[in-house]
Amino acid sequence: MKENYFDTLKVRLFQAVDNVNRYADEKDCNRNHVNYGSATSIARVMNDFGHDVDLPVWDDGGFLRIPKIVIDGKVWIDYEKNQSKSE
């Protein structure tokens, strides 16, 4: 259950990052880049609220990928770790 606006932003950030990586998998460059813009905008608002948000990004043949989400020093989602478990 969402308790405050920060929790709402966190959910939206998770959704945007998931979309970034999903559209990279689907090779949809426009949606990949739009969702990256959304993720970084949400992260910036969270920074403005005083939280440290780290969204590392790398280029995968023209598609952006975000390997993990780190908020206030805690790794919330690690896509690389989850990917290696499924291989």
Tell me what each language-model feature is.
Residues 14, 25-28, 42, 79, ...:
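Extended rod-forming repeat segments used as scaffolds/tethers
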Residues 15-18, 54, 86:
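Intrinsic structural disorder/low-complexity segments
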Residues 22-73:
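Acidic, low-complexity, intrinsically disordered interaction modules
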